[in-house]
């Protein structure tokens, strides 16, 4: 099986880079051949048991690194250990590297503009819209809208209908803490059960609406409040994936001190650590209400570049190009105060 190249644009340098997804060949083989797989095999691929087993072998099993190539992966993934909160010598296991903390207050600067939306994670980012009249409209390939939020969540389904969204895909080498993209009060916090399927580009294109099939945690933030970001309601959806068996809520207002669970009606500041994905690749999705946010122009331009190869193409009409973005960097702003913000 020949795999198409998957490229992305690094935001800081503007360079086009090629991604080498961890376990690329075997993961794509299993998912791209899913129509030929017995139903039991496909169910096993997305089960919590299988995901936890793979995570244990890769990150906890004493000989897992040598058996699955993790040591080679760690050597080649270009992790900047100088950013780490802990001394590098303490990061002596694959799990510790994956769950590392960084000095984000120094190495991930954030705009002082309170009405700007910041990226929730070190990730590769896609933009989209649920409104058919929008230039960013994407038909339901990545998720089924009602399934994503929950069919019984009528208030939120009505609030975000025809809105915009951001998909932030965390690859295995990334810093795996999620940070709050906006400031405001938590209006709802709940979990939707589901599978643990891979969120790599190949499997995502091979499956139907994968992000609404996987287990996910939904946090709804009201930003139209005093000291809020003023961009309406924002849904932050943290989605598990293959080898990600857990999402730990650990909100901190100062560095990583005194981590607290997320609770309804608590106020969250923008850019603070909110949660940690346990090992594997994973995805965070942001939903915005219609006409409340204007995305950064460089992210819009990158999305449809024709000189970059992407696996995000099947059933989409045209390839979609990811931009590699750092956590806490600006990805959009309140429309009312940033007229023309997203114009070329």
Predicted regions and their residues:
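Contiguous, well-folded functional domains in the mature portion of proteins
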Residues: 1-344
């Amino acid at each position: 099986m020949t795999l198409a190249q998957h490229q992305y644009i690094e935001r800081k340098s503007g360079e086009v880079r090629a991604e080498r997804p961890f376990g690329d060949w075997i993961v794509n083989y299993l998912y791209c051949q899913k129509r030929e797989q017995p139903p039991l095999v496909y169910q096993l691929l997305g089960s919590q048991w299988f995901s936890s087993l793979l995570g244990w072998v890769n990150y906890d099993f004493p000989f897992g690194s040598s058996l699955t190539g993790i040591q080679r992966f760690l050597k080649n993934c270009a992790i900047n250990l100088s950013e780490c909160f802990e001394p590098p010598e303490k990061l002596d296991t694959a799990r510790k590297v994956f769950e590392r903390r960084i000095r984000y207050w120094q190495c991930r600067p954030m705009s002082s503009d309170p009405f700007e939306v910041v990226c929730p994670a070190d990730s590769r980012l896609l933009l989209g819209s649920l409104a058919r009249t929008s230039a960013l409209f994407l038909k339901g390939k990545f998720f089924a809208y009602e399934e994503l939020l929950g069919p019984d969540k009528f208030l939120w389904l009505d609030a975000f209908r025809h809105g915009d969204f951001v998909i932030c895909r965390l690859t295995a080498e990334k810093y795996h803490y999620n940070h709050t993209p906006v400031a405001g009060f938590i209006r709802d916090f709940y979990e939707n059960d589901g599978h643990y399927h891979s969120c790599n580009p190949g499997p995502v294109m091979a499956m139907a609406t994968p992000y609404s099939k996987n287990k996910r945690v939904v946090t709804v933030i009201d930003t139209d409040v005093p000291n809020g970001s003023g961009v309406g309601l924002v849904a932050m959806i943290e989605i598990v994936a293959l080898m990600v068996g857990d999402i730990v809520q650990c909100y901190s207002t100062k560095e990583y001190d005194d981590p607290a669970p997320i609770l309804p009606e608590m106020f969250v500041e923008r850019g603070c650590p909110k949660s940690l994905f346990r090992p594997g690749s994973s995805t965070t999705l942001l939903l915005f209400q219609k006409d409340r946010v204007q995305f950064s122009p460089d992210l819009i331009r990158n999305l449809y570049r024709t000189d970059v190869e992407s696996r995000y193409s099947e059933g989409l009409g045209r390839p979609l190009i990811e931009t590699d973005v750092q956590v806490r960097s600006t990805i959009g702003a309140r429309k009312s105060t940033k007229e023309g913000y997203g114009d070329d």
